[in-house]
Amino acid sequence: YGEPKLDAGV
């Protein structure tokens, strides 16, 4: 949800 590492949208 906005994490720069998990930028997939989850």
Curated annotation (Swiss-Prot):
The modification Valine amide is found at V10. Keywords: Amidation. It comes from the Eukaryota. This antidiuretic peptide triggers the release of ADH. This is Pneumadin. The lineage of its organism: Eukaryota, Metazoa, Chordata, Craniata, Vertebrata.
